[in-house]
Amino acid sequence: MGRGCLAALLGGAVAVAVLVAVVHCAVTYDKKAVLVDGQRRILFSGSIHYPRSTPEMWDGLIEKAKDGGLDVIQTYVFWNGHEPTPGNYNFEGRYDLVRFIKTVQKAGMFVHLRIGPYICGEWNFGGFPVWLKYVPGISFRTDNEPFKNAMQGFTEKIVGMMKSENLFASQGGPIILSQIENEYGPEGKEFGAAGKAYINWAAKMAVGLDTGVPWVMCKEDDAPDPVINACNGFYCDTFSPNKPYKPTMWTEAWSGWFTEFGGTIRQRPVEDLAFGVARFVQKGGSFINYYMYHGGTNFGRTAGGPFITTSYDYDAPLDEYGLAREPKFGHLKELHRAVKLCEQPLVSADPTVTTLGSMQEAHVFRSSSGCAAFLANYNSNSYAKVIFNNENYSLPPWSISILPDCKNVVFNTATVGVQTNQMQMWADGASSMMWEKYDEEVDSLAAAPLLTSTGLLEQLNVTRDTSDYLWYITSVEVDPSEKFLQGGTPLSLTVQSAGHALHVFINGQLQGSAYGTREDRKISYSGNANLRAGTNKVALLSVACGLPNVGVHYETWNTGVVGPVVIHGLDEGSRDLTWQTWSYQVGLKGEQMNLNSLEGSGSVEWMQGSLVAQNQQPLAWYRAYFDTPSGDEPLALDMGSMGKGQIWINGQSIGRYWTAYAEGDCKGCHYTGSYRAPKCQAGCGQPTQRWYHVPRSWLQPTRNLLVVFEELGGDSSKIALAKRTVSGVCADVSEYHPNIKNWQIESYGEPEFHTAKVHLKCAPGQTISAIKFASFGTPLGTCGTFQQGECHSINSNSVLEKKCIGLQRCVVAISPSNFGGDPCPEVMKRVAVEAVCSTAA
């Protein structure tokens, strides 16, 4: 960061008694990098989306990102959150964009603002407001005047806000980059010439807003000048910009993957993520953004998909709750430090590539400022011994070593020296709740319908996304002489729906349910139809589970019951109900009465006592009160005993829950070889999401109102509030582990050997209470499964206990003298340790 920009950013960070001059920062680019005040920069960035956390979390998240070695915070701008109805804007609470950007500025960091306004992001309707679908004549993301007018209006609104607050770097603010559109390349091919015209218009419109900072388009090879095209993906080392005078930028380095209800948790090993980043840098990449760095939570009904979970954890370096995910956070922090040591050669010279073996090579950057080298082993199966500058180096499989002086290794992507945190959800029993219940009214449906229509209506056209729920209600007359009433073959009902979930009621009784999937959100329901003689009420509850967030022609997408709806087995054969008269009710009665709110929950009589647990029927509202647990650990609700529905705390929506069990392949994972989303799966046979984040800032000290709407039926007595804490820490470090401090000292002409060390650290308020495993020698296994190898020092446990028990953090040198002697001379040794963290009394 240039001195002028740094002064401007920090000028807003502290209250001082003198005026701080606004320093205008010039942000430009050339083929090597983004230039800030004329200085080429290697920039590490991380995605943190402001609506996916609370304003009270922003300071801590951004400070941790800065501590992790980031320079930039990247965020989308969420159109449907900011303009829920045409011309009515919301920039409050979690949507206070200006406050978020100023929080980044206060931390002395930059911002990459992705205005879009299409964002994808597994966010409801891709960030578009649903009302946009009903603008006459609209066609999304193509050369269409109604769409372009709306898009330009919102883009101008956001840019105008940023300018009025002096938030662009050209005004002394932190925003150094902006983005228009998002991942248009695949969609643009669908539109042909109209798509090309649209993307040219979008670029010209954005540049014409005169922000004074560069604009970016990601996954758009045809981005017109001066807009920079950038890469998204698990790897981007083969990417090149579309013009030789543009920098090589990676706007989304996927740190993990999103999760869908019914799917497994997708994890990306940090060794592979670090390898991908180092490989990008050695090929000339100079801007890297982790998507996500903190994923956060899809509060309310903001999750897209459909079927995207409420948790947007993304296996990111900072987990859903804002805690460091180790070793991912720490290992990437060391990577950033190592790359920054090479910054001047990297931005000053093109690499010289030298072959070191059949699958090994060196990328060397030489300039007047020094020499830096990246030694790569692309073999995913075996170590490689290579000679570089007449020195011998050992490279683990699928790894890159970084040498800031072309001599000393300070970092290897596959050699993890930081600790691993073992996390737990701890319920202390103090949060047990007394539950009350209120049954959603089904019998009175259609008494006062919103509307009636001949035939079936598309769900969004009726609800306008004001609720997930829409009732389709009709009647069926049955003659008393029907054979099925005299013991004949039972009737059946089939329903075709565009998704996403369907509950079928006949005469107030649940007949069955059906669900789509992300791959095929359409539903084909087939089940018994328990009709009786006379008039029967058929009520279909269609449930949206997040609107799709990716694809083309948003204006044509359908949700809800589309038909046909057919009764089978009558004496007449089949009776098609599709074109009967249908009545519609938007939302639930409980929603209309605001049962989720402090005021509304007092407007009805709630069932109390033992009847609540005994009567686990569908479409039920549950209510309980609880006091806020002590401490400052993040909180979560255990919903594993429930089925499917929504949760509110003090009137604010936690999000959708669904105890759908994960199906997949969880046979294990190794970091080597190209990563793809199905590669490393976890959670098979368990609920995809069991725990739901409860922000502490939403709570009051006592009598917090918890309301749950349950669609299917569940046991509310087992819902519990828990704290997310560190239960233990592990480390596994070689006595020859690369050390950045070694190189820094040696580079100043005083070579000095520094022993590798094991660092253990519990969470604040905790101490190390026990050593479950310790071995100095050749231990086997990984965290949680360590065991002694052929070589083991008998003093291992006692040394670790003496150094660590009773402390929050400890450091243990890896040397024979520290362990009372060398248990196996001439053998490379390691220390593996697993320690227990306990809350201090």
Swiss-Prot record:
PROSITE patterns named in the record: GLYCOSYL_HYDROL_F35, SUEL_LECTIN
GO biological process per UniProt: galactose catabolic process; plant-type cell wall modification
GO function term, MF aspect, one: beta-galactosidase activity
Keyword Signal assigned: yes
Locations listed in the record: Secreted, Extracellular space, Apoplast
Example of a GO cellular component annotation carried by this entry: apoplast
Known EC number: 3.2.1.23
Keyword Secreted: yes
Keyword vocabulary terms for this entry: Apoplast, Glycoprotein, Glycosidase, Hydrolase, Secreted, Signal
UniProt cross-references to InterPro entries, sorted A to Z: BetaGal_gal-bd, Galactose-bd-like_sf, GHD, Gly_Hdrlase_35_cat, Glyco_hydro_35_CS, Glycoside_Hdrlase_35, Glycoside_hydrolase_SF, Lectin_gal-bd_dom
Enzyme class: hydrolase
Domain SUEL-type lectin: 752-838
Catalytic reaction annotation: Hydrolysis of terminal non-reducing beta-D-galactose residues in beta-D-galactosides
Glycan-bearing residues: 392, 461
Catalytic machinery residues: 183 (proton donor), 252 (nucleophile)
Signal peptide annotation: 1-25
Pfam families documented for this protein: BetaGal_gal-bd, GHD, Glyco_hydro_35, SUEL_Lectin
Family membership: Belongs to the glycosyl hydrolase 35 family.
Stated name of the protein: Beta-galactosidase 5
